[in-house]
């Protein structure tokens, strides 16, 4: 008996919609990364993108535990000398709430071309509406 290996053209990809209201950021991101990778499927193959598309709604209502709301700091660099920037979790939620979930999930995916392909299947929206109705996403309760 030969070991099964998924072929990229034969992978069945479904669309799911997740409501992030009141969900803990890390626990939500872990499950999203797992499903983007395809590890929940029997035909999971490490070197093939077998994951599903995931739409996350209400990113602004994601929860964090403890004092992370005021203490957690996100850093990025502009590329110029002395151009390091920082923002707290509260500031990120106020300015670009989608980025909080995107950053958390991206850090849990593989680094490299395959990880970037998996990351592109994540669609995050701050509000309660999305423009992927044509894909008929199924509600996923995490």
UniProtKB/Swiss-Prot annotation:
Q: Which Pfam families match?
A: Ribosomal_L13
> Which source organism does the UniProt entry give?
Erwinia tasmaniensis (strain DSM 17950 / CFBP 7177 / CIP 109463 / NCPPB 4357 / Et1/99)
Stated family: Belongs to the universal ribosomal protein uL13 family.
The record's annotation in NCBIfam families points to:
rplM_bact
Record's protein name: Large ribosomal subunit protein uL13
Would you name any one GO CC term?
cytosolic large ribosomal subunit
Q: How does it assemble?
A: Part of the 50S ribosomal subunit.
Please list the GO terms describing molecular function: mRNA binding; structural constituent of ribosome
Report if keyword Transcription is assigned.
no
Which Gene3D superfamilies does this entry report, sorted A to Z? Answer: Ribosomal protein L13 (3.90.1180.10)
Which InterPro entries does the annotation name?
Ribosomal_uL13 (IPR005822), Ribosomal_uL13_bac-type (IPR005823), Ribosomal_uL13_CS (IPR023563), Ribosomal_uL13_sf (IPR036899)
């Amino acid at each position: 008996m030969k070991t099964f290996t998924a072929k990229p053209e034969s992978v069945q990809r479904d669309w799911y919609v997740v409501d992030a209201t009141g969900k803990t950021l890390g626990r939500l991101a872990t499950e999203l990364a797992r499903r983007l990778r395809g590890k929940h499927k029997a035909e999971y193959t490490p070197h093939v993108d077998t994951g599903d598309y995931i739409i996350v709604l209400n990113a602004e209502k994601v929860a964090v535990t403890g004092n992370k709301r005021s203490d957690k700091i996100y850093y990025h660099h502009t590329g110029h000398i002395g151009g390091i920037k920082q923002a707290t979790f509260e500031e990120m939620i106020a300015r670009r709430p989608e980025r909080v979930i995107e950053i958390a999930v991206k850090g849990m995916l593989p680094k490299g071309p395959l990880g970037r392909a998996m990351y592109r299947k994540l669609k995050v929206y701050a509000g309660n509406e999305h423009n992927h109705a044509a894909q008929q996403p199924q509600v996923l309760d995490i």
